[in-house]
């Protein structure tokens, strides 16, 4: 809210929000950059629930597809890492919400259930788990601000919960998401002055 209000008071009317981060991949290899077109809750609903006092408000969690296309168009053809466009699941937390087995408490669903769930969501073009996309999408939809998410994957959840990449690889992976945004910003002729 605060940043959006500041931008409004400063007279910035043509803003775009791009969240940059990391995620757990679902059927994509570590180091893949996922550009999110739609955010889903873990129940596979494409809305985010908030409350104003006692009133429930369900806000759609679709992100701006035109912004996604502009981001992709700004990338060099010979970019040295994979970029995919897909959907994301916003889990409630890092461990249980993603059915991980390496937290302080073990997830209640067994490995067979989890594997079937991952296969099901992968068929729905869901490429990653993270925790912010649905809230960001709902906020930006209500505020009528174009938005998307860019998150590099650190692990393929089909292969386990543990990150196996080296510290150097993780730094390089994180820089990939940032590079996608930098390429986009450099392509914007209206920002060159």
Model feature map: region roles:
Residues 70-78, 139, 180-188:
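Generic non-transmembrane alpha-helical segments
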Residues 4-15, 123-126, 185, 189-193:
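Non-transmembrane, aqueous-exposed alpha-helical and coiled segments at domain scale
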Residues 58-123:
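Active-site rim beta-loop-alpha module in soluble metabolic enzymes
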Residues 157-193:
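His/Asp/Glu-rich mid-to-C-terminal helical/loop segments that flank catalytic regions of hydrolases
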Residues 134-169:
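Zn-dependent metallopeptidase/amidohydrolase metal-coordination segment
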Residues 11-15, 29-31, 43, 79-84, ...:
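Short coil/turn connectors at secondary-structure junctions
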């Amino acid at each position: 809210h605060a940043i959006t209000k500041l931008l409004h008071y400063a007279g910035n009317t043509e803003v775009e929000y791009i969240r940059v981060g990391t995620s757990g991949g679902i059927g994509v290899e570590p180091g893949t950059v996922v550009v999110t077109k739609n955010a889903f809750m873990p129940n596979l609903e494409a809305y985010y629930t908030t409350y104003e006092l006692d009133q429930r408000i369900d806000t759609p969690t679709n992100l701006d597809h035109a912004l996604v296309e502009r981001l992709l168009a700004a990338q060099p053809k010979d970019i040295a890492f994979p970029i995919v466009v897909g959907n994301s699941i916003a889990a409630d937390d890092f461990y249980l919400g993603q059915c991980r087995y390496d937290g302080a408490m073990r997830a209640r669903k067994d490995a067979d259930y989890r594997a079937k769930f991952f296969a099901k969501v992968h068929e729905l073009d869901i490429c990653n788990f993270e925790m912010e996309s649905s809230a960001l999408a709902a906020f930006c939809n209500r505020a009528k601000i174009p938005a998307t998410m860019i998150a590099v994957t650190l692990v393929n959840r089909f292969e386990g919960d543990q990150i196996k990449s080296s510290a150097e690889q993780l730094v390089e992976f994180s820089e990939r998401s940032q590079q996608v945004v930098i390429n986009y910003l450099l392509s914007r002729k209206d920002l060159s002055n």
